[in-house]
Amino acid sequence: AMMASLSSCGSDAGSSAVSSGSEPASSGTESSASQAESTSGKLTDTPVTYSYLRPENALQPYTDNCETVQKIAELTGINLDVIIVPASDWATKMNTLMATNSMPDFFYLWTDVKEITSAGALLALDDLIDQYAPNIKELYDTIPNLDKATVNGQIYALPTIRMDENLEVGATPNIRVDLLEELNLDVPTTWDELYNVLKAFKENYPDSIPWGSRGEYNLIRSYTSCVTSLGADYNLYQDDNGEWKLGRLEENYKEALAFLNKCYAEGLLDNEYIITSAQDWKSGLASGKYLFYYDNPTFINSFNTTLKETDPDARIEPIPHLANSKGETRAYGFANHEFNIFGISPDVENPELAIKFFDWLYSGEGALLMNYGVEGQEYEMVDGAPQFKAEFIEEWRGKSSDPYYAAASEKGLGKLFFTPAWYSQAQNAFMTSSPDDVTAEYIYHVYDDQRDVIVDQPVQPPYTDEEAEEIQKINQNLDDYSTTEVNKFVTGERSLDEFDAFVSELKAKGADDLVRIANEAEARYQASK
């Protein structure tokens, strides 16, 4: 449980249950064993409170004591004490809680699982899963690569599992197609063609910035950043032979930075991209400040809705992936599942009940509640599948230009709240109010001819404790330095003539050791299969 600084968040599970291996509480409250024999159908007959901490998201602010939190208590006997931390302070707050041994019971991981495990801030889950979590056990038995999401062969964090078909295509190039038509320009098919389009935008629309980015991470460091499309990688990746490499050491990363630097120097790329928040970026696209972006295309509808209020012809659309300077077209998709997302504190009261609760969240009942709400109120079953009720959708369309996130904010639904089991298409029903809407299905079919272009993001092999500790130390040396220097290359503060020196600096900080450890762990993993 967390210390007095967040005292309202602490678990009171100790008043009603006992940890594994301890004696029953002196107050005569029920033990874990008796709770396992609940007569009410709940996970526990005696109410238990667990704290859950995650970062805020501007798209979906949390509503206190929302409907799903109330329903969880009714169905399971577990009260969730939800703590939302400002996104800007999230990593700092979590590092402080970890350093002071004050972790919440459940939390959203903020950094690499290996780092948190090395600090002793995650509960080992294997034995608990084997004994108390059949739904979770089945996931690890059936989902490819999920067994890689371990440290020293043990499970320390739980995944977000997609429960329906993946219509997501990853980050894409998205552009004001109405302006292409206005200037009689073809849709660009290569990055060089896009550069010329952006130059035309700058010349003809001087009050706008041709290219806007949601901060520097989404521009140059994320697996789904435009760097991949430009033919490079920033992070660890596997080449065609299965060998792990660190992308930012490679010459093709320098070439990607050179393109970004050219766009920055000519005012085509927003010169304030480093300090641009997600909300400011969204506002910029919805107001016409930005005319192109490379990021998640599912935001397009909300942008277009606002744009059309002042310009009925305005329209952002996704376009096919662009070929790089070598004529190659490549992109990482959004993963079917996301590994190592949720953690449980090693100090959690009654870990058996805690893992049972997560197992319930992965169950049909839990998944439907956390994605769709209450049956008969927010959704109904149609041909065996959940569908939001038409009147619920229309109610929220009348309240907000971004109806899904507004509804999810009030009710406590979806991936931006607490969904270990995630229905990724749940929000699509809110996006089909007009034939002109850019729906998930529409976006999916834009890339019908590029399915082989969109590949899975790399999944690193499982590491031993010693490897994890060494990787943590190396990344501490590399991460902040890499971020600072890479942004200097983009902005021109550092010349790309010094890229080889930058690579040497990274190697001096342990980059080669990082690659070596990844390849040794991969060889060990492959030999064990």
What kind of feature is each model-predicted range?
Residues 4, 9-193, 221-227, 234-237, ...:
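Conserved N-terminal structural module of periplasmic/extracytoplasmic solute-binding proteins
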Residues 46-50, 76-81, 100-105, 120-121, ...:
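Loop/turn elements at helix/coil->beta-strand transitions in domains of secreted/extracellular proteins
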Residues 55, 360, 365-484, 493:
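Conserved small-residue motifs centered on glycine
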Residues 109-112, 295-299:
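Beta->alpha turn/N-cap motifs
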Residues 116-127, 154, 303-329:
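Ligand-binding "clamshell"
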Residues 152-221, 237-284, 289, 293-296, ...:
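Helix-loop-helix "hinge/cap" segment bordering the ligand-binding cleft or interdomain interface
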Residues 320-333, 385-393:
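Extended amphipathic alpha-helical segments with heptad-repeat/coiled-coil character used for oligomerization
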Residues 323-327, 336-346:
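Membrane-embedded translocation segments of transport machinery
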